Amino acid sequence: MGKIVFGGAMSHVLDPDYYQAACGDIGRQKVTAAMDAIATMGDRFVEKKADALIVVADDHMNAFSFNCVPAICVRIGKAVQRMVQDNAEAFDKVLDHMPVEYPLHEALGNDILEQGLQNGFDLALSWEAPVDHAFLSPVNTMLGKRPIPPLVPIFVNAFIAPQPTARRCFQFGQHIARVVAKSPFTVGILATGGLSHFPELLLGRVGETDTVFDRKLIHWMESGEHEPLLDLTADELHKTGSHEFLNWMVLLGAVSPARAEVRYFGELPRINMAAVEWRLA
């Protein structure tokens, strides 16, 4: 019988140089503190000796385009490549120092996809989509020079309306937990993104955050109050800059009813950063 043995969620732009340029010295200090906390989370993940690591993140119109934006997409196959761009955005330049190819856990990815389709989840699949900073910056920050286990990347449409609902993302996380429980694998799961910010897709609000809303989300996760999170609407997530919290909702469904333990929270003019862990037996 399989088991989810580790859960973590964190911001996914993890580059001191980027925050130095965007926010000055305080930006470098805070992202460095966040990265230190994430590396310590990695110590605990390594102790679990997981067979696979599921990573739930959003695409930044790198793997997909307006020709097709899947609500939820499972990356399947034997390996995945990191995104390579000639003129990468500043936050994607961090990829230049990371490995080019990563192993995938083919069996687990296929099970999540196939059993999901059999149980009412209209999932997309990809054999070729590359992964960007949203997937690889957290994984490499958490594990450093240590071996990276086979991954199962899952893309959630966080930005392009209509997005999946918070409740549906939570339900998909519950589906992941059921698939893992029926498997022979021990599994970690990461969700990435946030907290509140407005990316370049929303130019008029770049630089804004919503600390009050972020702290409310954290309180609900720490106390295990998932009902208010299930009722979050697309309008609420949009107004507060919390689009990427949909990734976290998938994780919450997978690890429920466990309560969150905050490892780092830091306010910046451009984004509020967090690193959160769920202690699972």
Where does each model-flagged region fall?
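Flexible, D/E/H-enriched segments
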Residues: M1-A50, F66-Q171, K182, L202-A281
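Nuclease catalytic cores that cleave nucleic-acid phosphodiester bonds
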Residues: R178-F185
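A structural signal for small-residue-enriched, beta-sheet-centric alpha/beta enzyme cores
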Residues: L195-P199, L203
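Short HxH-centered metal-ligating active-site micro-motif
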Residues: V55-H60, V179
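Phosphate-rich cofactor/ligand-interacting catalytic cores and adjacent structured alpha/beta frameworks
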Residues: Q174
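Beta-strand elements within well-structured catalytic alpha/beta cores of enzymes
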Residues: D51-A57, I154, F185-L195
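Active-site environment of divalent metal-dependent phosphoester hydrolases
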Residues: A63
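Short, glycine/serine-rich, charged loops/turns that create anion-binding
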Residues: H12, H60, S196
